[in-house]
Curated annotation (Swiss-Prot):
Name of the featured protein: Chloramphenicol efflux pump Rv0191
InterPro entries referenced in this protein's UniProt entry, alphabetically: MFS, MFS_dom, MFS_Efflux_Transporters, MFS_trans_sf
Induction or repression: Expression is negatively regulated by the transcriptional repressor Rv1353c.
Record bears the keyword Cell inner membrane: no
Localization per Swiss-Prot or TrEMBL: Cell membrane
Disulfide bonds, paired cysteine numbers: none
Keyword Signal: no
UniProt membrane topology term: Multi-pass membrane protein
A cellular-component GO term for this protein: plasma membrane
Alphabetical UniProt keywords: Antibiotic resistance, Cell membrane, Membrane, Transmembrane, Transmembrane helix, Transport
Molecular function (Gene Ontology), one example: transmembrane transporter activity
Length: 413
């Protein structure tokens, strides 16, 4: 779709030091954006005390963030469709930088919320362009590996970024944590401007983007997006209350609870590079295996939730289910986004934008449904997650053609 200068060598040497550096910059962009997005999670109490508001009110920052991102993604992606891809990415990172600076200096909750809105507006734009940029840096046969390299940054944000900002908020205050994120975002924006090719669209490519795009009429893309929304909803129904699940369902408490949470994140970090090659060579099989594992993990946790006693065996089984959940929830995301981009044809950015919107709707729906079911019982909440994952798995199984890679020969997929 684009013609970046100086990338012709990638057809023969896809993993040159230059390409590795460019992909690393993209991973850093994903890392800093996700770290900024979830910064309030580890600083809820600190923000509430400092701004003299309730913890519940601070918690709504995450819900409003997802809502703004869901509403603005598709219009913003269409409006910027004619921009060079590097410009769209850098503008997103600059907006992130400004939003974090506004947050750090916010005198009250309203200003803090306004800063978060600015960050949320360009959230969808960044996630719509970052994976397509990565795939354009390498040959089509390496697109899956390029996409998963970005998700390493996402996993690191959960394993390193969020705990680090939480610790900084506790020790030195949440404003300093926001200042550090501001500086890191500015550095990544500069690195992206210097390291990435401009990626200007050709005249013939402009015919398929922006207002001319008809992704909502693309049945293949719509199906991928709907299945994504169902799966993400199933995940977030329970993920919001994962600490409670570990404590009351698995039966792990105290310091071991923190270690199991860390294992959840590390499992996701490890799984991403492991699925990179299968995603390129066997995309259909990879996504089915991933969704089967997620469904099994939630089914096992549901069975444990209906049990009445905690034993060493149930703790061991529950621990395995939590780790499997962490590994596959992270691994499946690049699989689904890759399928969405392939479905978009000549406009992978626009297709990715629709995918991001579906993802954000899934986050909101999952959090809302999870809150309603949590008030009734953990068992019902986990049953809903298992059921939604099962529905998504069934849909993906009967529609495996959605995940085919057209660059592969029939024997490869």
């Amino acid at each position: 779709m684009t013609a970046p200068t100086g990338t012709s060598a990638t057809t023969t040497r896809p993993w040159t030091p230059r390409i590795a550096t460019q992909l690393s910059v993209l991973a850093c962009a994903a890392f800093i954006y996700v770290t900024a997005e979830i910064l309030p999670v580890g600083a809820l109490s600190a923000i509430a005390r400092n701004l003299r508001v309730s913890v519940v009110l601070v918690g709504t920052l995450l819900s409003w963030y997802a809502l703004v991102a869901a509403v603005t993604t598709v219009p913003l992606v269409r409006w910027t469709a004619h921009w060079p891809r590097r410009r769209a990415l850098v503008v997103s990172l600059v907006c992130l930088t400004v939003s974090q600076l506004v947050s750090a200096l916010a005198p009250n909750f309203a200003v803090l919320a306004a800063g978060r809105v600015l960050c949320a507006v360009t959230h969808g734009l960044l996630w719509a362009v970052i994976a397509p940029i990565a795939t354009r840096l390498v040959p089509p046969s390496h697109a899956g590996r390029a996409t998963t390299s970005i998700y390493i940054g996402t996993s690191l944000a959960l394993v390193v970024g969020s705990p680090l900002t939480a610790a900084m908020s506790l020790m030195w205050g949440w404003r300093l944590a926001a200042v550090c994120v501001t500086g890191a975002a500015a550095a990544v924006a500069l690195a992206a401007r210097l390291a990435l090719p401009e990626m200007v669209l050709r005249a013939d490519q402009l015919e398929h983007v922006g207002r001319r795009a008809r992704h909502h009429r693309n049945p293949r893309l719509v199906k991928v997006s709907v299945l994504t929304m169902i799966a993400v909803t199933g995940h977030f129904v329970s993920y919001t209350y994962i600490v409670v699940i570990i404590r009351d369902v698995v039966g792990v408490r105290g310091p071991n609870l923190a270690w199991l949470l860390a294992a959840y994140g590390v499992a996701g970090l490890v799984s991403v590079p492991l699925v990179a090659r299968p995603l390129d060579r066997w995309p259909k099989g990879a996504v089915i295996v991933g969704m089967t594992g997620l469904t099994a993990a939630f089914t096992l946790l549901t069975a444990l939730a209906f049990g009445e006693r905690h034993t060493a065996a149930t703790a061991l089984l529950g621990t395995g289910a939590i780790v499997l959940w962490g590994a596959l929830a992270t691994a499946v995301s690049p699989m689904l986004q890759s399928a969405a981009m392939r479905s978009g044809g000549d406009d992978p950015d626009g297709a990715s934008g629709l995918y991001v919107t579906a993802f954000q709707i899934g986050i909101m729906a999952g959090a809302l449904l999870g809150g309603l079911l949590y008030e009734r019982s953990l068992a019902m909440m986990l049953t809903a997650s298992a059921g939604l994952m099962g529905v998504a798995l069934f849909g993906m199984t009967v529609s495996q053609h959605l995940f085919e890679n057209p660059t592969l020969s029939p024997g490869d997929g």
